[in-house]
């Protein structure tokens, strides 16, 4: 695959429920601590190498940011790193929080 695909928050939730894709959150550490999709891996410059070492490049990856914009750059980066299928979640965490508040974890 040469580029990432877009995924609605509803589609992302279905992948999440079925555990058929990895969910990564690229927001800043404070935002992630305040609340994130349950089970989301916090993907930062500091955690990127570990993520790449541990990842199965054949498993789809869903990238979540604040509103669905900055996730696009991260999604394209993961495609360039060799991931087979990568999605950017439209609406990002704000849409996830609005639609699926029961699927949020806070570290505070």
From Swiss-Prot:
Listed GO CC annotations: cytoplasm
SMART domains noted in UniProt: RHOD
Protein name: Thiosulfate sulfurtransferase GlpE
Keywords: Cytoplasm, Transferase
EC assignment: 2.8.1.1
Domain Rhodanese: 17-105
Reaction it catalyzes: thiosulfate + hydrogen cyanide = thiocyanate + sulfite + 2 H(+); thiosulfate + [thioredoxin]-dithiol = [thioredoxin]-disulfide + hydrogen sulfide + sulfite + 2 H(+)
Domain of life, source organism: Bacteria
Subcellular location: Cytoplasm
GO biological process: glycerol metabolic process
SUPFAM superfamilies per the UniProt record, alphabetical: Rhodanese/Cell cycle control phosphatase
Active-site feature positions: 65 (cysteine persulfide intermediate)
GO molecular-function term, one example from the UniProt record: thiosulfate-cyanide sulfurtransferase activity
Principal location listed in the UniProt entry: cytoplasm
Family: Belongs to the GlpE family.
Gene: glpE
Membrane-traversing stretches: none
InterPro entries: GlpE_sulfurtransferase (IPR050229), Rhodanese-like_dom (IPR001763), Rhodanese-like_dom_sf (IPR036873), Thiosulf_sulfurTrfase (IPR023695)
Role: Transferase that catalyzes the transfer of sulfur from thiosulfate to thiophilic acceptors such as cyanide or dithiols. May function in a CysM-independent thiosulfate assimilation pathway by catalyzing the conversion of thiosulfate to sulfite, which can then be used for L-cysteine biosynthesis.
């Amino acid at each position: 695959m040469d580029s990432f695909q877009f995924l609605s928050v509803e589609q992302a939730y279905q992948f999440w429920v079925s555990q058929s894709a990895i969910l990564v959150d690229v927001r800043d550490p404070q935002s992630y601590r305040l609340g994130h999709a349950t089970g989301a891996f916090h993907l930062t410059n500091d955690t990127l190498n570990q993520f790449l070492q541990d990842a199965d490049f054949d498993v789809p990856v869903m990238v979540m940011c604040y509103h669905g914009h900055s996730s696009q750059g991260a999604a394209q980066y993961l495609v360039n790193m060799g991931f087979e299928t990568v999605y950017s979640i439209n609406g990002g965490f704000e849409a996830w929080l609005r639609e699926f508040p029961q699927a949020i974890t806070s570290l505070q």
